[in-house]
Regions:
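Active-site-proximal cap/lid insertion segments
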Residues: 1-124
Length: 124
């Protein structure tokens, strides 16, 4: 498998090639794209990973609050809305060690990169 292989790009390339090869035959064409991202394994092309590097270093609680504030400023949600608390089974950010925080931030970066890459490929 090529070093830069990413399933969403491969599926999209294959679908585009099939559409192009059937474009002129005048027959109906059905396509079903069943992407596997953003499920395990968590991986994404480097360009997408680079885009999210450091974005989640503040932790999930702080990011949730920033997103809520931005939505309130845009009048998307009520000004009295509050960030939902983290479920008890999930550790609070400030209770994690620095290495655990770094790992969680990295997982969120990769997940965001996968969703972004998937969205890009669907748009092609």
């Amino acid at each position: 498998m090529p070093e830069d292989f990413f399933s969403s790009a491969f599926y999209t390339d294959t679908l585009i090639n099939n559409i192009e090869s059937h474009r002129k035959d005048g027959k109906p064409f059905f396509a079903y794209a069943a992407y596997t991202a953003p499920h395990w394994p968590l991986q994404a092309p480097k360009a997408f990973l680079d885009k999210y590097q450091g974005v989640y270093d503040q932790g999930y609680g702080e990011i949730a609050q920033q997103r809520l504030t931005r939505m309130q400023e845009m009048a998307i949600v009520d000004e009295h809305a509050a960030v939902q608390s983290t479920p008890d089974f999930y550790p609070k950010w400030d209770k994690l060690t620095p290495s655990q925080q770094a790992r969680e931030a990295r997982l969120m970066e990769v997940y965001a990169a996968m969703v972004d890459a998937l969205d890009y490929n669907i748009g092609r």
